[in-house]
Amino acid sequence: MKEDRVVFIFGPTAVGKSNILFHFPKNKAEIINVDSIQVYKEFNIASSKPSKNLMKHIKHHLVDFLDPEKDYTIGIFYEQALKIVKEIRQKKKIPIFVGGTAFYFKHLKDGFPSTPLVTSKIRIYVNNLLELKGKSYLLKELKNVDPIRFNMLNKNDIYRIKRSLEVYYQTGIPISQFQKKQSSEFKNIVIIGLKRSFEDLKTRISIRINEMLNSGLLSEIKGLFSKGYNENTPAFKGIGYNEFLLWKSRPCYGLNDIIGLINKNSFLYAKRQMTFFAKISDVLWLHPEDDLDNILNLIFKVDKEI
C-alpha cells in the first residue's frame, strides 16, 4: 500500500486550479488548501475562496476558519497540514494539496525546520530593539550570533531578521542550527504544476477582478471596514484587499485607480509565483485544460495503488 503518497497541485493566481477539481471523482480524495488568505473568515471574494458547489463536490480543509485578526504562519500551516494528511489517509483517500502560496509548498516538499516556539515576551523585546535602535542594530546583532543565517538573508527581510534573533534569544542556539535538521515528512509526492502563457494569465486576471466586482467585492470591503478591520489586520495583507486601504486613507484614489492597482499587483504576483515555483524540482508542468486527462490519470492512478 502506497499510503505515504501525497499530491501537490500548484500554479499562479487565475491559472485555473479550482476548475480542475470539479473533474475529480467524489469520495476519492480530499483537498488541503494552500493559501495564506483563504484561511480567514469574512474575507471571501478577493481571496477567491472555493465555491460552495466545489466544496460540496470535494471536501476542503484549511478554508474559512480563522479570525481575521489572527496571524497565520508557515509553522501553523505545516502543523495543521500534517495532522489533516493523517486523517485523510485513515479514510483511504488521497491527500491533495492545492493552492498558490509557493513558500508553503517549498516547505511541504523540503521539510520545515523544527524551530521552537517563541514567547510573546521575546517578540516584544525584539520589536522594541527594532523601534529603539533600528534595523542596522538587528543586522549587527544577527551577524554576531548567527553569521551563517546573516549571510543567507536578504538584508531588507525584516520579518526573518527578527525571527532569527527571536529564536536565538529564546534558546541560545542559532536558527541556522535548527534548519540543518529539516527533512520532508513526505517521501512519495506527485507534483503537478499548472501553467499558462503570461498573456493568457493577464487576461484571466482581468476577467477575475471584474467577476469579483460583480459579485459584491465593494460591499464586502465596506463591510470589513465597518467592523473595524484595518491596515493592522493580517487578512488585509492579501492582494485585492490591501489596495483598498489606499482607497480608504487617500481620497485622491478613485475606484478605477484601485482596480488598476489590483490588476497590476495580481499580475506581478503571478510572475513572482512562477519564478518561485520554477525552483521546485520534480514538477510535471501541465495545462489545466489541454492536459486535463493526463492530470486525472496522474492523480487517480495513485488511487488504484492504495
Curated annotation (Swiss-Prot):
Q: Name one GO biological process term.
A: tRNA modification
Enzyme Commission number(s):
2.5.1.75
What superkingdom does the record give?
Bacteria
Binding-site positions, substrate? T13, A14, V15, G16, K17, S18
Q: Where is this site: Interaction with substrate tRNA?
A: T101, R123
- What are the binding positions for ATP in this chain? G11, P12, T13, A14, V15, G16, K17, S18
Query: Pfam families per the record?
Result: IPPT
What segment(s) does the record annotate as region Interaction with substrate tRNA?
35-38
Signal peptide span per the entry? none
**Which reaction does this chain catalyze?**
adenosine(37) in tRNA + dimethylallyl diphosphate = N(6)-dimethylallyladenosine(37) in tRNA + diphosphate
A GO molecular-function descriptor: ATP binding
Keyword Disulfide bond recorded = no
Q: Which cofactor does it need?
A: Mg(2+)
Its job? Catalyzes the transfer of a dimethylallyl group onto the adenine at position 37 in tRNAs that read codons beginning with uridine, leading to the formation of N6-(dimethylallyl)adenosine (i(6)A).
- Assembly mode: Monomer.
Which family is annotated? Answer: Belongs to the IPP transferase family.
The name this protein goes by in its record: tRNA dimethylallyltransferase
Organism of origin: Borreliella burgdorferi (strain ATCC 35210 / DSM 4680 / CIP 102532 / B31)
Q: Which taxonomic lineage does the organism of this UniProt entry have?
A: Bacteria, Pseudomonadati, Spirochaetota, Spirochaetia, Spirochaetales
